[in-house]
Amino acid sequence: VAPPLEIAEISPAPLVIMSPRVGVSSAGTDIFPATPPKVSVKLINHMKQSFKGEVAFGFENRSPETRVRVDLSPEQTSTLAVTIPNTEENRAAHLRRPELANSLWFSLRHAGLHENLIKRSVPVVWLDARVAERVNVGFVRGFDFSLPNALNALGVESKELSVDEVKTSDLSTYSSIIVDNRVYESQPELIATNQKLLDYANAGGNLIVFYHRIDEFNPNPQRNRPQLAPYKLILGNERITDENAPISFLEPEHPLLNSPNKLNQGDFKDWIQERGLYYPREWDPQFKALLQSNDPGEAPLKGGLLVADYGKGHYIYTSMVWYRQLRAGVPGAYRMLANMISYGQN
């Protein structure tokens, strides 16, 4: 039986707040990003009468709280967009007691009353990350919203591109373009216009492709699928299923691992489920392999993060499961994403 009122969904969850000075300023100044984070709260009124009240929200065990009035018609579903205020209390919350600022609560109340009719919380991840200036990302989305949520958390300008928009728009306006997980399968019509993506990279853009399966990416004349990468790149069945498998930096000074965030072993802690899938088994020497890892007792795999210069631009292919880590709020995944979309920028 449905409750009379419901906070059905809070998005994004977890809430990732990018704060480049986390843990630096004892006064808590500059703890919030320049653009305060936004959260969507989906409300459902299951009753046959209207409801007038308010949504209150704040960090656990922190004050003050913020209130927003809501007016729900009978049996109405409504999505409320709220902004986490850039107040002195909120800026200082994480620094004073980090363990008490790692959750954000939302409650539905009658107007003017303090009693919670319903209350829900989402975890908060405070992220120490930087993104290059003037980054503008276009992306072709995969099966979920992990990527757009992560780009929003990083505070970068971004736009989801349909295949038609890839085909007809001026791609040079984007500093980076991401082809999300398995997009060549979920939107196979992109294959026919893939050459335009390669031309974008050749002209100076930064093209990033997330993991795909063998039968979605490897050249296959029978399925009219040409080589999708600018150079030879053949995926295999190899995977790393141990989420704690050790990571080696093969080229520790490479810019992709150092700018604008210097990555380290800590960025690969607290991963969930696995490291990567369908690791490349063969690639052109133009590609540089930056990371190496393996399951216990298995041969090392070097194709988890490949990068190549292409014309005036760059091409990155990564078979690592960043989407799972972004969705789980793993800080290192956000720092790596920030480096990928910043690659080639000053």
Segments predicted by a language model, with ranges:
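Short, aromatic- and glycine-rich surface loops/edge beta-strands on solvent-exposed regions
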Residues: 1, 55-57, 90-114
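Short, solvent-exposed loop/linker segments at the N-terminal edge
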Residues: 26-36
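Asparagine-centered strand-capping/turn motif at beta-strand->loop junctions
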Residues: 43-47
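Short acidic/proline- and small/hydrophobic-mixed sequence motifs that coincide with surface turns
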Residues: 48-53
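Intrinsically disordered, low-complexity Pro/Gly/Ser/Thr-rich segments with frequent PxxP/GP/PP motifs
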Residues: 62-90
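Aromatic-Pro/Gly-enriched surface loop or interdomain linker
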Residues: 100-180, 211-218, 232-234, 239, ...
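A glycine-rich, often tryptophan-bearing local segment used as a flexible ligand/cofactor-contacting loop or short
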Residues: 182-269, 318, 338
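Catalytic beta-strand/loop cores that center a nucleophilic Ser/Cys/Thr
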Residues: 237-330, 335, 345
